[in-house]
Amino acid sequence: DTIPPVALFLVQQDPRSDYKVSYAITLEPSAVLPEVAPASVGAARLAPDSGLLKSTPDDTAEAYADILEKDVESDAYLDFDTEGDSLRAAVGLAAKQQIRSSLPATASVAFSHELGAAAPIALATNDAGAIVAVNLNEITTVQPVEAGAAVNPTGQVKALSGLAISTKGIRATYGDQLLFYVPAAGSDAKIVLLGYSVGLVKAGEI
């Protein structure tokens, strides 16, 4: 089988420190990376609050999270390209609705998000846009809704939380590393998801 390419972002805190991997993101099969400056020159890293882009890195992450939770009802829906975005199919609104419908009547589920701890990285592209890596946490909370009821975590959530049953509820946090192409400010082009990596980072009782 063909191994999908991975985009690595390595960060060096100072000239004497070792490089450390900040992001390791699997690219989408259809991803086309925009051109950046040659390695001999180096791509410029843009400030997190740069006004040169259609959306700042943090705003891009927040907007995409809103799409994963609301789909076409999100105010940001038309700002992002849907073609080739397999993460929406995996964890988007339809997947969340399927989780909700699979629960018994004695339990409820809520979905939320927050920015992750990793600092965003934006590298300028030759067309005045940027390749942007961001860290987003998606949070799933399952709670019993009736007295005496309980919830039963499964799979990785069960293994990481160490719980087989809970009368209080379970909260699981999934860390998303997302890679986008963000066009220049004023551009009519859409933001494109170039790749992503997702993993369960925390799980426990409420």
Question: What are the roles of these predicted feature ranges?
Answer:
Residues Q12-Q13, Q97-Q98, Q143, Q156, ...:
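Residue-identity detector for glutamine
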Residues K70-D71, N137-Q143, P183-A185:
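Generic structural motif
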Residues V36-V109:
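Core segments of small alpha/beta cavity-forming domains
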Residues T2-D66, G129-I131, A164-I206:
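Short beta-strand edge/turn micro-motifs at domain boundaries
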Residues E146-G169:
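Mixed-charge, low-complexity intrinsically disordered segments
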Residues D1-P4, S108-P153:
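Surface-exposed, charged secondary-structure patches
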Residues S101-S102, V109-H113, V157-L160:
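A short linear-motif detector with a strong N-terminal bias
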